[in-house]
């Protein structure tokens, strides 16, 4: 096996273990044993478990962002863009279940990038620009676009997590319900929202 092939093998083994057990519960011993190599081989390629985990997470983030960015950059109407973005996330969850499980688990302590929260922030900042333009067109305050972007992306991401853990509904139905809530909620935004219940 070439060095490159060995590296890919270790990434595949690590990805599966991180998805099944999480970062903390996975050991270098386990990774090397499943790959049929000695521990020094893992250290040689990645410097340790943290390095392997970082490569796995970076690949998963790139794959997910690629799908969502493609959906968001298409020159479509707002609803179609929302439908494509929700479908892109659900497609990723369906085709890369292990990858999504890794992304939604907590990152190792002290790691500020490569977490699900940072991924959500990246996607939300892209959505923010789309919403700001739509808000201006509808004479709503574009300064609230970051807030709505976080809410919208969070809703889709958390629903994706729920669907992964209990896939009783078809993917298309989940996407349709997501878009229904998001679109109809966005379609009726108040210019100056207020709470009606007194505190």
Regions found by a protein language model. Name each.
Residues 1-5, 142, 190-199:
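N-terminal intrinsically disordered/low-complexity leader segments
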Residues 53-60, 103, 119, 123:
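Alpha-helical DNA-contacting segments of helix-turn-helix folds
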Residues 55, 69-95, 149-152, 175:
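Hydrophobic alpha-helical connector segments
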Residues 62-65, 112-136, 146-151, 173-176, ...:
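Amphipathic alpha-helical packing segments from all-alpha helical-bundle domains
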Residues 92-114, 128-132, 161-165:
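Amphipathic alpha-helical segments used for helix-helix packing
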């Amino acid at each position: 096996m070439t060095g490159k092939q060995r590296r890919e093998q270790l990434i595949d083994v690590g990805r599966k273990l991180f998805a099944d057990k999480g970062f903390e519960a996975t050991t270098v011993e386990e990774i090397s044993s499943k790959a049929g190599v000695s521990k020094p081989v893992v250290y040689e390629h990645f410097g340790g478990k943290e390095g392997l985990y970082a490569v796995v997470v970076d690949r998963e983030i790139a794959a997910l962002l690629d799908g969502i960015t493609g959906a968001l950059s298409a020159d479509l109407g707002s609803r179609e863009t929302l439908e494509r973005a929700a479908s892109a996330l659900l497609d990723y969850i369906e085709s890369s279940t292990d990858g999504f499980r890794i992304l939604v688990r907590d990152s190792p302590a002290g790691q500020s990038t490569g977490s699900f929260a940072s991924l959500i922030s990246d996607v939300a900042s892209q959505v923010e620009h789309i919403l700001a333009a739509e808000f201006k067109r509808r004479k709503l305050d574009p300064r609230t676009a970051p807030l709505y972007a976080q809410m919208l992306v969070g809703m889709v991401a958390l629903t994706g997590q729920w669907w992964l853990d209990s896939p009783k509904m078809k993917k298309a139905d989940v996407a349709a319900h997501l878009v229904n809530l998001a679109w109809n909620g966005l379609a009726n935004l108040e210019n100056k929202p207020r709470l009606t219940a007194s505190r």
